[in-house]
Amino acid sequence: MRIPNIFLSYLRQVAVDGTLSSCSGVKSRKPVIAFGFDDSQDSLVDENDEKILEPFGYYRHLLKGKSARTVLMHCFNAFLGLPEDWVLGVTKAIEDLHNASLLIDDIEDESALRRGSPAAHMKYGIALTMNAGNLVYFTVLQDIYDLGMRTGGTQVANAMAHIYTEEMIELHRGQGIEIWWRDQRSPPSVDQYIHMLEQKTGGLLRLGVRLLQCHPGGNNRADLSAIALRIGVYYQLRDDYINLMSTSYHDERGFAEDITEGKYTFPMLHSLKRSPDSGLREILDLKPADIALKKKAIAIMQETGSLIATRNLLGAVKNDLSGLVAEQRGDDYAMSAGLERFLEKLYIAE
C-alpha cells in the first residue's frame, strides 16, 4: 500500500469515466496513461527516472562502499535485536537521504569537488541536480512508508512518516540557519553553532535510530537517540578540524574549503570570540581562494588556541559518548562491542 495521492486519484477517475469521486485506493507510483495512450508505455517511467536521477546515481557510485552510517545502524541493532530486513530497509533509506542531501549541500555551498571529482551540479547542472535531490527526499519517504506498512501496518507506517517529516524539518532548519549566517556574514555564538549541528548533522543519525525503533518487536526501550545525536556532532566537529588540518582532506575537497565557502566552523567562532580584532573576520568575509590568505587565517586560529580548543571539545564529546554507551549496555559488554569499535575508529588520536 502506498500513500494516497489526491492528484493521481483525480486523474484516474477522469481517465476512466470523466467524473470526479473521492480519492482512495491509489497503490501505484506510475502515472495513469489516458487520452488514447495504452498502459504498455509504463516503461517510460523507468527510463525517465534513470535520466532525471543521473546526478543521484553519480554520487551513489562515487561514494560507494560500506559507509559509516550503514555500519552504525548495525551497531545500534546490537542493542535492539531487530530483523535484518528491517535494518537493511532503514539503512537504505538513510543512505539514499544522505546522498540526496549532498547533491543539495554542494549547490548551497558552491562546492566544486566531491571526493576529488567534480560535484554533481558541475557535471549535470544546478537544475537537474537540485530536482534529483528533492525527488529522492520524497522517494525515501515513500520507501519508509512502504516498509512500515509491510511490517506493522498503518500505525507503524504513519509513525515512520511522522518521524521522517519531523527530522527533515529540523535538518532544513539547521541547514538554513547555517546558510543565513554565511550569507549575512553574521557569526553565531558557539552555543548556537552546536545547536545547528544537533539539527543538521546529528539529526540524520537520530532519524535512523528513531526509524529502527519503530519496529513493533525488539528491545525498543533502549535510548539510543542521544548517542546518535552526539556521534553526529562529533562527526561535524571532527570535519571542522580536519578541513583545516588534514592533507588527505585537502586532496579530496581542496585546501581549507570551509574558508572559501564562507562557512563559520567551531575553530573560527572560537578564534573570533577570543580575539575579535585579529583580522580573521576580515579574511573570512573575503571567502578567499588564495592559499596564502587561508594559511594566514589558520595561523590566527592557531595563535588564539582555537585548534587546540576544537580538539579539547572533541575529547569532551568523546567522554560524554563513552558514558552514554556504558549507561545503555549495563553489564552486557558484548552488546556495545561493535559500537565501541566503530567509535574508536572515528575518534581523532589524542
UniProtKB/Swiss-Prot annotation:
Dimethylallyl diphosphate binds at R114, K200, T201, Q236, N243, K263. Mg(2+) 1 binds at D105, D109. Its cofactor is Mg(2+). It catalyses: isopentenyl diphosphate + dimethylallyl diphosphate = (2E)-geranyl diphosphate + diphosphate; isopentenyl diphosphate + (2E)-geranyl diphosphate = (2E,6E)-farnesyl diphosphate + diphosphate; isopentenyl diphosphate + (2E,6E)-farnesyl diphosphate = (2E,6E,10E)-geranylgeranyl diphosphate + diphosphate. Gene3D superfamilies: Farnesyl Diphosphate Synthase. One of its GO terms (biological process) is terpenoid biosynthetic process. This is Geranylgeranyl pyrophosphate synthase. It comes from Rhodocybe pseudopiperita (Clitopilus pseudopiperitus).
